[in-house]
């Protein structure tokens, strides 16, 4: 696994969509990638991991997890950019088993997003320990297989507020 210390072109970009409408989300994704100055050529022929926030088994309307329309739109964009494969993977809270992942993907809408976009859902629950010898405190990390095996990783969080 290779990492890079290069600085992003734009550290943060926010794009508003007034509702979860597929056309609005598609336009928002296009604009977001444009603001971040991310060229489609980066993804050509690559195995790309989309890492949503799938904290727990919740319906999209509960606004706990990354919305599946956003993941579908991003996967569609990646395939238009000629990504070789798009994988949806996370290590949610609770049990990390194929059965638990199946339930979370179904409830959170990721199964439908994958079916509609052609993305692949991860059911590999293995991990690899990687070293970070120059780290100050934690020098080893357990990373799930799809993270280690991906050429590129796009982390797509869920913007939340907590009291």
What are these regions (language model features)?
Residues 1-163:
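N-terminal and secondary-structure boundary signal
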